[in-house]
A protein has these predicted regions:
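Rossmann-fold NAD(P)-binding glycine/threonine-rich loop
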Residues: 1-33, 52
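Active-site-lining helix/loop region of Rossmann-like oxidoreductase modules
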Residues: 34, 41-106
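Short, flexible active-site loops
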Residues: 1-2, 39-43
Length: 106
């Protein structure tokens, strides 16, 4: 079973190793099939650098995703765990690789 690194997430470990880098977590909670044809799928982006996050959120929108600001980089741990759940559902629960998580409001 996957366990997060001592830094809390892989993204946090990268940020700690490269303190001058503008590290974001994005595009990790769906498969390549959704990347190829997003059709409005939600794409969460977590990071501490507002300017870098704005670029990635705009990129997600331009690609056809519904961009979602997932907050600071510490939330990368949540996104990494969401990816673990996606992998399980895709490979062990019969959902296949062409699904994505959607965040809806009533």
């Amino acid at each position: 079973m996957w366990a997060p690194p001592s830094a809390g997430s892989n993204a946090a470990a990268i940020a700690a190793a490269f303190p001058q880098a503008r590290v974001l977590k994005a595009f990790n909670h769906f498969g390549a099939e959704v990347m190829a044809s997003p059709n409005g799928a939600d794409a969460c982006v977590a990071g501490d650098d507002a300017a870098a996050k704005a670029v990635v959120l705009a990129l997600a929108k331009d690609m056809g995703f519904t961009p979602r600001d997932a907050g600071p980089l510490r939330n990368a741990a949540v996104l990494e765990n969401l990816a673990v759940l996606w992998i399980h559902l895709a490979t062990q629960s019969g959902m296949g690789r062409q699904f994505y998580f959607a965040f809806k409001t009533p």
